[in-house]
From Swiss-Prot:
The gene is rnp4. Disulfide bonds: none annotated. This is Ribonuclease P protein component 4. Part of ribonuclease P, a protein complex that generates mature tRNA molecules by cleaving their 5'-ends. Its main location: cytoplasm. Signal peptide: none annotated. It comes from Methanococcus maripaludis (strain DSM 14266 / JCM 13030 / NBRC 101832 / S2 / LL). Optimum temperature is 36-38 degrees Celsius in the absence of L7Ae, 48-50 degrees Celsius in presence of L7Ae. It is an enzyme of class 3 (hydrolase). Keywords: Cytoplasm, Endonuclease, Hydrolase, Metal-binding, Nuclease, tRNA processing, Zinc. GO terms for biological process: tRNA 5'-leader removal. Consists of a catalytic RNA component and at least 5 protein subunits.
Length: 110
């Protein structure tokens, strides 16, 4: 049992490294204008995370459109705004499919 747990930890570490490599490649391809290739890299990274039953890293999760799956580059194919109407939050709009993602901002309690 201990051997299996050690193997799982090692394989999850390898999977996390592969996800980081794929997301860096997706960022490069999206910067150069090859959006289809970057979508494929994002999809591969998601499949690896699902197969290993591990959560997708938060730093990369916010850079992916949940509707069309494209890699978001702020200012190029995504618009970022801060709003404080009902509650303070960041609004990220994908300019390819016009989907909106809202991320709440934690405020310090008085």
């Amino acid at each position: 049992m201990k051997l299996k747990k050690k193997f799982l930890e090692k394989s999850k570490k390898v999977a996390e490294e592969r996800i980081n490599i794929l997301m860096n490649l997706a960022e490069k391809e999206s910067n150069s204008g090859k959006t289809e290739r970057s979508k494929n890299y994002v999809l591969l990274g998601k499949k690896i995370a699902m197969r290993m039953r591990m959560p997708y890293p938060k730093e990369w999760k916010r850079r992916i459109c949940k509707n069309c799956g494209s890699f978001l580059i702020y200012g190029k194919n995504a618009r970022v705004r801060t709003k404080a109407k009902n509650y303070p939050h960041v609004v990220i709009t994908c300019l390819e499919c016009n989907s909106i993602t809202r991320i709440p901002i934690k405020t310090a309690k008085k």
